[in-house]
């Protein structure tokens, strides 16, 4: 199974999406990518939705 994960950047409110092989619950915060304005240099994203996609 594959899952479409929709993300919102916690600092910029930018939206992205990715495919994952396991579900990630909505509300989960993940560190993904770089953010030069973040103290630790990591961009943080909140999962806004997780949908199973047909293969």
Across the structure, where does each feature detected by a protein language model lie?
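A short beta-strand micro-motif
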Residues: 3-9
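Short, surface-exposed beta-strand/loop "edge" segments at domain boundaries and coil↔beta transitions
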Residues: 11-16, 38-42
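N-terminal compositionally biased, intrinsically disordered segments and leader/signal-like regions
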Residues: 11-13, 29, 47-49
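Short, flexible N-terminal segments of the mature chain
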Residues: 15-35
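Short, mixed-charge low-complexity intrinsically disordered segments
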Residues: 32-55
């Amino acid at each position: 199974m594959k899952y479409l994960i929709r993300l919102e950047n916690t600092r910029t409110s930018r939206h992205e999406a990715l495919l994952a092989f396991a579900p990630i619950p909505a509300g989960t915060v993940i560190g993904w990518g770089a953010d030069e304005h973040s103290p630790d240099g990591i961009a943080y994203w909140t999962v806004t939705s997780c949908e199973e996609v047909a293969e």
